[in-house]
Amino acid sequence: MLEKGEHIEYPNTPPLHSPPESHTFSSQTDDSYFHKPSSTGLFATLVADTNSSVPSASRSPESIASSQSNDSAAIPSYRRKRRKVRKPEIVKPTLRKRGRKPKNISTLEHDKSKPVISSLIDEDANLSQIKARKSVLESRFSRLEEAFRDFYIKNLEKTEDLIRTDSHFVLNKELLSFRNDYEHRRKHYEKYSQCLNKQLDHFFSYKVTTVHKSYQRFATLLRRHLLDKTAKRYHDLCEKRPYKYITTDLLSPSLTCFASDILQTVPEYTSSQSSPVLLPATPSIVTNKQMMDDLTLCNV
């Protein structure tokens, strides 16, 4: 155990880049073995400089600058002190304030600007100078007018020649685009009209066939109904006559099929003096007049 006031002395470690013969452990303190730690970073404090044994006075400025650059390069970028750059002040645009209208409008009478025509002419100009100025301006305007007229006439003549020879670039381009658009629209409408005509034909043919079938069915049902009504009427009329043994049932649905039987004979009575009764048969084909008569008769 150590007593108070005593401390352990460790041998001084040699520098990292010292020659091998100097690796001797001694308890004596030697300033050449120590390297003053640099405050620039951890790497510079741990790694000894190769030129530590050389005094600073005898070192060249190039070596000092290189060592300082190495020390600064050893510092990581996020630890370096950045120089503060003064930001330029943002110049704000000045707002133009509208001037207040003066309460007294009479103050503006002296600030009125001169009119344009009067500003072009001096106040001290004579009448002859004004007339000369007027003549100069008139001649200039006449020359400008002639130049513009010649320019537009030449352009119009050139344009007319180009149109006449069918070589006007802009008009030909417009005509070509118009023709292409017209042809495209015409083909489109032709296809559309053909498709529409097909749909209409199909629709009308379907409707015609449907109506025709419905009419045929309705006509058949009406004819059968009228025949049944007329047969019933005939039966009611024939019940009042003295006949027997009728072989055909007048109310049967087969009335439309016995058109070959034009007349039906009824057998004689027990009396030999009576004559046979002739009954009209139900027709298989009904005319329009007979149909209307039957409808009126049967109250259908």
UniProtKB/Swiss-Prot annotation:
Compositional bias (Low complexity): 52-69
GO CC, any one term: chromatin
Keywords from the named record: Meiosis, Nucleus
Ranges of biased composition (kind: Basic residues): 94-103
Polar residues bias spans: 21-38
Region (Disordered): 1-38, 50-109
GO biological process: meiotic cell cycle; transcription initiation-coupled chromatin remodeling
Cell location: Nucleus
Domain of life of the organism encoding this protein: Eukaryota
Predominant place of localization: nucleus
Stated role: Has a role in meiosis.
Name of protein: Meiotically up-regulated gene 165 protein
Protein's organism: Schizosaccharomyces pombe (strain 972 / ATCC 24843)
Lineage, broadest ranks: Eukaryota, Fungi, Dikarya, Ascomycota, Taphrinomycotina
